[in-house]
Regions:
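PAS-family sensory domains
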Residues: 1-40
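A short pre-motif secondary-structure segment
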Residues: 168-171
Length: 258
């Protein structure tokens, strides 16, 4: 875009220098120069600069009382801090405060979205319901602070490289996280669940008094079904079976039953 002679006079600076003050990222984000003065309405652009700053640019059309076009006024505002606060609030609204996993509300919204995608032809997805074995014993023996450490430890495993980028782990209730595995068959989901189970079994957690604690978990596995209630019920049934057949194992749901 150009810089007017009036702008030079107002700020006492050569127009070439004025134009050079505008970051390249901003120039790249704006419409081509030939379009700027044919645009009939006000417009807003948001640009992320290389140094991490976010700038909002408002283009305001200036007209006379009779409606004649006088030009455009460009207003630039640093909104970096505002966007940072918004991201923080969004994270708090969707994250479990103890574990850092996705909270139930956000997780269920993602599950519903995945169900819709599958209904419209997307590949199948798998669903895991996890439950720490004898977790009450951990709380009773070492205290709730250590119990919280165990939950955080499991959450860290889930957030680590054991899951793929497209997978989502959430805390649905108490010591029962769940994992949504998009574009995943039940067979592939079983392999992922086993990898998670073994990783937890082979790890240790330090109690508040310095003792090393080992815990295991049971996993109920099912395909994502046509509605969330059926998906949760199916994975819960498989989890219940895993608990009642020795714990520390992965059980697939029998979805052939009516």
């Amino acid at each position: 875009f150009g810089v007017s002679t009036l702008s030079e006079e107002l700020v006492g600076c050569d127009r070439t220098k004025l134009r050079a003050m505008v970051p390249t990222e901003v120039l790249d984000a704006l419409p081509p120069a030939e379009q700027l003065y044919t645009m009939g309405n006000n417009a807003t652009y948001e640009v992320a600069l290389a140094q991490g700053t976010t700038v909002r640019i408002d283009m305001v059309q200036i007209r006379t009382a009779r409606g004649n076009d006088l030009g455009r006024l460009w207003l630039a505002q640093d909104i970096t801090e505002r966007r940072r606060r918004e991201r923080t609030l969004e994270r708090l609204a969707t994250t479990d405060t103890l574990t850092g996993l996705t909270n139930r509300r956000a997780f269920m919204a993602r599950l519903e979205a995945e169900i819709t995608h599958i209904a419209h032809g997307a590949p199948p997805a798998a669903f895991l319901m996890l439950d720490l074995d004898h977790f009450k014993r951990v709380n009773d023996t070492w205290g709730h602070a250590t119990g919280d450490k165990v939950l955080v430890h499991l959450a860290n495993l889930l957030r680590g490289n054991l899951l793929r980028k497209q997978d989502m782990a959430g805390r649905l209730r108490g010591e029962e996280p769940a994992v949504l595995l998009p574009n995943t068959t039940v067979e592939q989901g079983h392999a992922i669940a086993e990898r998670l189970r073994i990783a937890l079994e082979q790890s240790t957690i330090a109690s508040d008094d310095g003792q090393s604690i080992r815990v295991t978990m049971s996993v109920g596995l099912c395909p994502v079904l046509p509605d969330s209630a059926s998906t949760l019920a199916s994975s819960d049934a498989a989890l219940y079976q895993a608990k009642n057949t020795g714990r520390n194992r992965v059980v697939r749901a029998d979805t052939t039953k009516a």
